[in-house]
């Protein structure tokens, strides 16, 4: 039976290092002797239910760890469930009891170190690169046991589309990229190709061949096929390591790149510069024949370089871009890769790329920027020296990317511990039940205090293409080391509320200087246009995005400003200014003023805002209005808020809820769920906007109807149903945030209970 282990309890490894005793660490371990018959039956039932309903609900409910934690804590829901018949007759007690039921349920799910675990996955292209890398390095059997493989196969089979392919995420249509690499993964795991049958492999291979073959894989896929030896580097767009020599005054250089692309490309450029290819095996030779409609020896690789299946092509590749990459290829391969320049420049560039890799690996404790760069870095370190400590340190961190749920084993981003914890704590702090959950609040506050970055990256970090981090919070844990602006804002919001509480109640508080450090980070990250970026201060010219070689997502070259990050920053800085009116007051005021103008400038004609990190226009509208209201705006004095309220009232469904399709994100226009169904996460977000927009003072019925939906949706144990996938990454890749079904619904009920209490 699989069990989730937290922090130092997950065991130690001499090749692991940590900044805070592995706080937030999440490791899944298999124990063949664990679990009673009843527990094993419960897990099997959850798996079967997902498989039976996977065509309707493709994002899992993340049940396995929840079952485990509730059992370990002997949780029993003692507050009676509420059922509403008439929305007009909801009482304060009805809403409050529903809220308390949910709060008590969430308190039982808190880990011992104070955070809330959760899946943060959904991308179908994360698993296979880990399998390919470990196959190449000869460590596949050491890292992935038979039980790991069983769960990985479960995941692939559960999320294979009816046409035989796999999408970029669990919701999407089939992509060449994901179908090819998942096919390879199946073959590495020993699944027979079964060319004439109806097996997963046979259907996947048919899809690949019917759509032109693996030469139509986008760049990331081509890179993995090249290192495996089932594609040729000459068929890839160039990734020259000489790029890292570009000085800071160049329009594009290592410092201007979007941090995630930078982290990925430094390892890709190393592998490209060395033209590394794995030693051929019988399986590799078979794959060369299975992935293409023509013989491998007859493929013209130069013609394949710019190919991309139409199913994968989200960000169009222009003629200007094609010309640009042809010129780069000519210069890179015809000059830099030939004598004497290969000795004078190329070899030095390869060494420089590896120096960057080692620096960034050490600075992130070998977690790197996420699942995509992690595995490229790991392979590059093995190519440099298979016996090196660098590679062994990478191997020791692979388990940190593994998550197991009822749909199987998936590689996740690296976790959303801080992000989810900050939201859950804000809900609990707003629920007015402090005395009932004091130990939960104390542990949560401790987790945030200990997870803040107290130093900048090590050494000469500017020349190593890193930005400041002191005072920030990351997305997952302190060890990873990358500050994220909205995680800073939401975590600081919690810490400011805790700061206002008595020490007798909450215990040890953060030093005020650390609160100041967090504010300094936010002020630093605001751009001239008033928006705030997410990982680093934005730099570089926007026209550079025209040159992006990444076909399946958008805005990948540069750091950008984001609506949600700006809204969150305004909220917390408005609170900070009230609690600490003497610290950088004028700068904070200026930040808020510019931030409000930025938010208003992004509003769409229908009154909504596009959400960059959630689904989508409802999500964006929530963060926008939250920021506007925190800055002192109201329905009466702000046209933007009035338009936002009208937008939500216009799209409220007959049931009283809201539900938005993930298709809104790539299409960039509002699309309701099929059948105008309700989603509790969107309903919670919309309900909060209406209350913040003063709807209770004008016509409270739409709010009451939405509250009825949430109250009646709550399950017997206090949980809410997992319905649709609710996160997104770079417009076109969906992410599963199962905890959103709890945090946004309960957060909405905190607003609602306070609103109806005022009517008493």
Swiss-Prot record:
It catalyses: (S)-2,3-epoxysqualene = tirucalla-7,24-dien-3beta-ol. InterPro entries: SQ_cyclase_C, SQ_cyclase_N, Squalene_cyclase, Terpene_synthase_CS, Terpenoid_cyclase/PrenylTrfase. Keywords: Isomerase, Repeat. PFTB repeats lie at residues 149-190, 641-682. It is an enzyme of class 5 (isomerase). It comes from the Eukaryota. GO terms for molecular function: lupeol synthase activity. Disulfide bonds: none annotated. GO terms for cellular component: lipid droplet; plasmodesma. Its EC number is 5.4.99.56. One of its GO terms (biological process) is triterpenoid biosynthetic process. The active site is at 486 (proton donor). Converts oxidosqualene to tirucalladienol. Belongs to the terpene cyclase/mutase family. This is Tirucalladienol synthase. The lineage of its organism: Eukaryota, Viridiplantae, Streptophyta, Embryophyta, Tracheophyta. The gene is PEN3.
